[in-house]
C-alpha cells in the first residue's frame, strides 16, 4: 500500500469513528506517524482527502452497477447488487451520516452528487422496466408511480445509516444486515406473485 492509499485508509477509519468535524489533516498525519507536510504533499487539504474517499465510493458503486450490463437481469441479481451497494455506503458511512452538512461544506461533492442523480435515476428506471417485462414487477397503478418509488428508495438508502447511528449504534440486532433486509423489503408490495415467490426463495426477510 503506497503513502496515498495509507492516508486514505487511515482517514476513512478516523472519519467513520469520530465524524468529519473531529478529524483534521493534522490528526490523520499524527495517527500515521508522518509530518503534516508529508501528508499535504499528497492531499493539500482535508477537502481533497474527503473528495478522494467520495470518488472511491462512487467507483465501488459504479463497478457494481456495471456488472448489471454484463448479465441477464433478474430479481436475484438486482437484489445482490443492491446489497453490495448498501455495503459500500456503510464502508464510507461518514459521508452518509452527515450527507447534508458535507454537501453544504464541500461544493465539489454536492455538484458531483447532483450531476449523477438523473443518470442514476434513468438506470434504475431501465432496470424496473426489464423486471416488469419479465413479469416480476407490477405495472404502474397510477402515473409516475415508479418515479415516486425511485425517489423514496433514494431517500431510504441515503439516510438509513444516519438513522441507524442515532437509534441503534450500540444494538447489534439492528446492524447492517437488518437494515439491508429492511430496505429490500421495501420492494415487496411492488412484486407480482411470481416476483414474490422469487424474492422469498433467496432472501430471509426482515429479522
Report residues per predicted region.
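N-terminal positioning helix adjacent to the helix-turn-helix/winged-helix DNA-binding module
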Residues: 3-10, 57, 149
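Helix-turn-helix
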Residues: 6, 14, 18-48, 52
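Short, basic, alpha-helical segments at the C-terminal edge of helix-turn-helix-like DNA-binding modules
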Residues: 55-62
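Secondary-structure edge/capping motif, primarily at the C-terminal ends of alpha-helices
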Residues: 65-68, 96-103, 135, 160-168
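Hydrophobic alpha-helical connector segments
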Residues: 66-92, 150
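Amphipathic alpha-helical segments used for helix-helix packing
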Residues: 90-111
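Amphipathic alpha-helical packing segments from all-alpha helical-bundle domains
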Residues: 109-136, 147-162, 178-189
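C-terminal peripheral helix-coil segments that are non-catalytic and often amphipathic
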Residues: 162-207
